[in-house]
């Protein structure tokens, strides 16, 4: 006689089974499962008890088929090497979880071709929305997807050649805060060290020029277009840097000189460098959360024109 135990796959319990166990109508179970009103606390408790007893789980596939949604979002970053990107992701992930969305993610290694391929692949898998930290350049490959209803939000950089929402740090305001700080310390010859990111460098440079002019300080375009090599010999007493990488480059380039440095965006160990580096800081997790909230509103039916949301910045003087 065999001692083998035969395993029988019992059918999964249905809402009809729950209704029968709880002694209520099928519609009542549906209301409880979907969090709809119209059920007394006592009845809801009885239905929830039946759900627990039977081990019932809602059929997400059927529900999503009815709504035409997949309850998934796609997040595409230009790189994972920057801790700022991970913080953006955390903020977005929290919002997605709160609203019942699963978040897919990928990175492009700052390659526009990979960005297009990855974005369209996520759209082909029917994500409900996209959040993108884009590479510079055109994003018109998303025009047809956005017109087809894929909610899309760009973060840290605005979209180019496509109409979509964007969430950015207040770059122009950040430049003005930095110049005000340096001018307040008595600096008159202030330079700007930009980077390859066209939008951010242009916006910060314009903010610097406005702030310098407002204070009657020299607006020298040569000093507002520095790179690390030119900074090493430039006639400046202070420099504002476009991002973390440029700030570190300025620290190396000005190591033998007494040049005051303010960076846009905080970074690890900035407070431990001698002398410590002042920064114009913004909260990347808040940027991710704000982008997620904006996307959820779009998915809920917000038809307002695309908007650009600016997250506030603050000076951390060191």
Predicted regions and their residues:
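Amphipathic helical "hinge" segments at domain boundaries
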Residues: 56-121, 126-129, 209
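N-terminal helix-turn-helix DNA-binding module of bacterial transcription factors
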Residues: 1-70
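Hydrophobic alpha-helical segments within soluble ligand-binding/sensing domains
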Residues: 165-192, 226-229, 247, 282-300
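Flexible loop/hinge segments that line or gate small-molecule binding clefts
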Residues: 110, 132-177, 245, 265-277
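An alpha-beta-alpha
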Residues: 176-215, 307-318
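Short beta-strand segments enriched in small/hydrophobic residues
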Residues: 26-31, 65-80, 181, 189-195
